[in-house]
Regions:
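Bacterial N-terminal signal peptides that target proteins for export
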Residues: 1-9
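Hydrophobic h-region of N-terminal signal peptides that target proteins for export
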Residues: 11-21
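Substrate-binding cleft of secreted/luminal carbohydrate-active enzymes
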Residues: 509-555
Length: 555
């Protein structure tokens, strides 16, 4: 019979050697890392291997993988072999793969059919037939005054609502110009409260029309170059929120952007610097033109009509005029001219006749972002095929819907015919996505980004090019979704909101900082939120230096 002291010693030895030791229960069920690699290159495999090895070593158990996985069913043999290597690495490190896919906001399905893009309306655009072609009739009332910067008094330009600091920040330059004899130069940005160096003019437009603004710009040691912008505003917000890249030093370059006038009769065009610090910027030869049929969309939900000038006669495509398409369709760089309508030999349309053309077109914003239409049935057929591919090659238990930042929609005929709010359209879309996933993988757990469902974030009206209001979207989605909140500033309100509705949640933390203070703030909120499943290391810039410390912090 052993003594009590010896018995205690044996117990300590057994526990210390792991014979009776039990692992400490995990603090969170979901401990993930976000990874973006599409396996188009062999080196991507080694990069993912390194990340998941680090993740596994430091207690993480999931990889949210952005890698073009919605098209996995079309991958070639080499790419599928790389996929198997990644799957093997994840198994070795006990890392679960969670695919993220089907981004409405960032163009899911456009590679399959670009016509699935959200459509902006153009109504009753005038065309004139000359011979066997009809072309847009330029709006005689469209005018941008003093676009060549030739009319001025001192350093004040005529025709413009304002330009910052005439004689201090903005100057007439008769030595450097692109056309004519003068240009507008900006410098001395650091001497202004906000580093502004802008010029703005308000112009009259026709509602629901397509326009292009162009200008010539030149830079010298501009800093930061990212401060350069061209913006078109309606009464409340930007209607052409497009990011224009301009080198810090550059000779004259032409810059152009396409915009919709939406429902407005007047728009404000801004060009210049916001937050400039150093260098010089020149502008010359501003121009605005009405466009037509550029990036025209052809799908059931974006009908095109050609009528007589009085609207009484509707002409038939394929009979009175040849099928219409933009053969130079390009989201990022729309064509500079306008497609013509080709009149057929036996058409009812006569030479010299005026026509009215109504259609829908696609427009990219920011850095080329294009949203897709949630009301077009073909999109859901595409997702069904996509889900089958994901099931076949990954068969994941968890799926993640990339349904963030949906910045266009609600304006095409397909959306209007439903008589639903944008919140209802979004909720219906998410419900269908979830059903498609569970048809392919019964019992799957589905996660989703929070912002378009969160009144503290993007679930509201007046959102970019969206025609409608996302309010109430959270009332129309499956209650067993896991909501991934990522807005750090509103983390407490957001997590409390979804928890109060009975949803499970996940925290999207980190976001490429130089330390883990963001993560520490999230951990505090996570620990106070009922039904929160865990936290994710979310890097968009592929910064994984702090991943080990992150894993140790959430153990």
């Amino acid at each position: 019979m052993t003594s009590p002291r010896l018995h205690s010693a044996i117990l300590l030895i057994l526990v210390g050697t792991g014979v009776w030791a039990q692992e400490k229960p995990a603090r969170y069920a979901d401990r993930w890392v976000y990874v973006s690699r599409n396996l188009s290159k062999p080196e991507h495999v080694e990069e993912v291997r390194a990340i998941v090895a680090t993740a596994g070593k430091h207690g993480l158990n999931g990889m949210l993988w952005s890698g073009g996985l919605e098209g996995i069913g079309r991958w070639d043999a080499k790419r599928l072999a790389r996929l198997e290597a990644v799957k093997d690495a994840c198994r070795q490190n006990q890392i679960e793969i969670i695919p993220i896919l089907w981004s409405v906001g960032y163009g899911s399905g456009l590679g399959h059919d670009r016509n699935l893009a959200a459509g902006l309306p153009c109504t009753d655009v005038p065309f004139l037939v000359e011979g066997k072609e009809a072309r847009i009739v330029a709006d005689p009332e469209l005018e941008l005054k003093n676009g060549g910067f030739e009319e001025y008094k001192g350093h004040a330009m005529a025709g413009y609502r304002f330009h910052d600091g005439p004689g201090e920040v903005s100057f007439v330059d008769t030595d450097i110009f692109h056309g004519g004899k003068s240009s507008l130069r900006f410098e001395n940005f650091a001497g202004t409260p906000h580093g502004h160096g802008r010029v703005m003019q308000e112009i009259a437009v026709k509602p629901q029309r397509q326009y292009r603004f162009s200008c010539w710009a030149k830079t010298e040691d501009l800093g930061p170059a990212s401060a350069f912008r061209i913006q078109v505003y309606g009464p409340k917000a930007a209607i052409a929120p497009i990011t224009v890249r301009m080198p810090a030093t550059s000779d004259w370059q032409q810059i152009s952007l396409t915009f919709s006038s939406s429902e407005f009769a007047k728009v404000k065009i801004y060009a210049g610097l916001w937050g400039g610090k150093t260098g010089k910027l020149w502008f010359d030869d501003f121009k605005v033109e009405e466009m037509a049929l550029v990036n025209v969309l052809r799908r059931p939900g974006t009908p095109l009509t050609v009528t007589s000038d009085d609207g009484q006669t509707v002409y038939e495509e394929g009979k009175d005029y040849q099928p219409i398409a933009d053969e130079h369709f390009n989201f990022r760089k729309p064509r500079l001219d306008c497609p013509a309508i080709k009149v057929t030999a036996d058409s009812r349309i006569q030479d010299g006749q005026r026509l009215r053309v109504s259609y829908y077109y696609a427009m990219a914003i920011n850095h080329g972002q294009v949203s897709v239409c949630m009301s077009e049935p073909e999109l859901y057929e595409y997702w069904r095929k996509s889900a089958a591919g994901v099931k076949k090659h990954l068969n994941p238990e968890k799926w993640f819907l990339s349904m963030d930042e949906i910045r266009a929609g609600g304006s095409c005929a397909a959306c209007k015919a439903r008589n639903l709010t944008m919140g209802e359209i979004l909720g219906d879309c998410i419900t269908k996505q979830t059903e498609i996933i569970r048809e392919a993988r019964p019992g799957a757990k589905v996660y989703i980004w929070s912002d378009m469902l969160d009144p503290n974030h993007n679930a509201h009206g007046d959102y970019y090019l969206v025609d409608g209001d996302f309010a109430g979207s959270w009332e129309h989605i499956p209650k067993d979704l896991v909501i991934a909140c990522w807005y750090f500033k509103k983390r407490e309100e957001s997590m409390r909101f979804f928890s109060g509705l009975g949803f499970e949640t996940l925290a999207g933390a980190y976001y490429d900082a130089d330390d883990l203070e963001n993560v520490k703030g999230w951990i505090k909120t996570v620990d106070q939120t009922p039904k929160c499943r865990g936290i994710m290391y979310t890097s968009w810039q592929r910064k994984y230096k702090l991943l080990p410390a992150f894993g140790d912090l959430i153990r």
